[in-house]
Amino acid sequence: MPIIEPIPMDELSPVSRAVIESGCEEGLYATPIPLQLFAYSTRHLLAMDDTRRLRGSGLLLGGRILELLRIRSAQLGECQPCMQSRKHDSITDEDVACLLDMDGGNLTEQERLSVRFMDLLSADHHAIDRAFYAELAEVFTAAQIIELGLSCAGSMGMHRFIHTLEVFGTDEPVVKYSADQVDTAVEPVGVA
């Protein structure tokens, strides 16, 4: 069981339940469990779902690069469901293997630099210096570089957060489900 007990499907609000069921049916999500956790904050569940639905649709980097980044982020964050799922038809097992060994494979220069950016942002963000940005600028526009950075930051943060929740943990939850925990807040001390 995750650290925070997922909201049971039959206890979800109609909006949250529709988001989770349609997302899983459409193949956007490999498992409903993280979404059942995010449903504690309906606003954030909806925002996350909107972001996921936009990914690769009309964005400047394209679906293949964004999918490679999502998988690499999952590898770095040790998110098993996301490592195993493929959300873009062009991604092969060979492509995924290339994410672990950047010297081999058939990745394009844009793909290789995108994955390298993700790796550096994860492990040594100080190495993303002027020279690296100049290298990026040889194959990307400024708008694509911004999209790359924001996509990597969002994906990496999400996978690390999901990892901390122990989505597939076997221990009892630290925070048990209670309906009064959904879309509510404890007033900060000293605030009237």
Predicted features by range, described:
Residues 56-61, 104-107, 134-139:
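Short amphipathic alpha-helical boundary/capping segments
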Residues 62-69, 143-148:
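Alpha-helical scaffolds flanking conserved acidic
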Residues 66-89, 152-155:
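Short, thiol/selenol-centered motifs that function as redox-active sites or metal-ligating centers
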Residues 95-109:
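Acidic/His metal-coordination segments adjacent to aromatic residues that form catalytic metal sites
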Residues 1-63, 88, 180-192:
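Mobile cap/lid helix-loop segments that border enzyme active or cofactor-binding sites
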Residues 109-150:
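Acidic/histidine-rich alpha-helical segments that form the ligand environment
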